[in-house]
């Protein structure tokens, strides 16, 4: 059998009252009223409290989002109109219908990846039917007519 544990004695009421009376006489600040803070500003700014980092039990999204605009979706198809053919012959420029969300840098990267050609610049416009047209100007070391034959435009 274990030895009896030592139990701390509770101070009796009279001793505790004497202790409190002594503290009051000496002027201990625990028993005095707290002085009110004087506010000089009209607006009240709520104090900043501790914000813990989020630690979720499970992820709310099951799969990471995939890129919906890849190179094959950016370039829809090349234009084969007479004006587009004239651009190919005269200005060393290919004309494509592209995705409406694609910007010039994405169009340039898609043309480079799909056809292995360097582009000098890309001009875009949105047609009245709501599609985006891109004029892809090639560098002088590439011939737009040869590229058009390779693609199958001509």
Curated annotation (Swiss-Prot):
Pfam families with a match to the protein in the record: Ribosomal_L23, Ribosomal_L23eN
Keyword Lipid biosynthesis: no
Any single GO BP term: translation
InterPro entries for the chain: Nucleotide-bd_a/b_plait_sf, Ribosomal_uL23, Ribosomal_uL23-like, Ribosomal_uL23/eL15/eS24_sf, Ribosomal_uL23_CS, Ribosomal_uL23_N
Superkingdom of origin: Eukaryota
Any one of the GO CC terms: ribonucleoprotein complex
Keywords: Ribonucleoprotein, Ribosomal protein, RNA-binding, rRNA-binding
Sequence intervals crossing the membrane: none
GO molecular function, one term: rRNA binding
Role summary: This protein binds to a specific region on the 26S rRNA.
Protein family: Belongs to the universal ribosomal protein uL23 family.
Protein name: Large ribosomal subunit protein uL23
């Amino acid at each position: 059998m274990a030895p009896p544990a030592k139990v701390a004695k509770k101070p009796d009421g009279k001793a505790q009252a004497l202790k409190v009376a002594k503290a009051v006489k000496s002027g201990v600040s625990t028993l005095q009223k707290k002085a009110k803070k004087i506010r000089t500003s009209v607006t009240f700014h709520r104090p900043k409290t501790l914000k813990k980092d989020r630690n979720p039990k499970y992820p709310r999204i099951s799969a990471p989002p995939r890129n919906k605009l890849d190179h094959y979706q950016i370039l829809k198809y090349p234009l084969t109109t007479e004006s587009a053919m004239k651009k190919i012959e005269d200005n060393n420029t290919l004309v494509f219908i592209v995705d409406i969300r694609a910007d010039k840098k994405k169009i340039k990267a898609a043309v480079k990846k799909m056809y292995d050609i360097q582009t000098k610049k890309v001009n875009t416009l949105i047609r009245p039917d709501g599609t985006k047209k891109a004029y892809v100007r090639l560098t002088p070391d590439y011939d737009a007519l040869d590229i058009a034959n390779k693609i199958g435009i001509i």
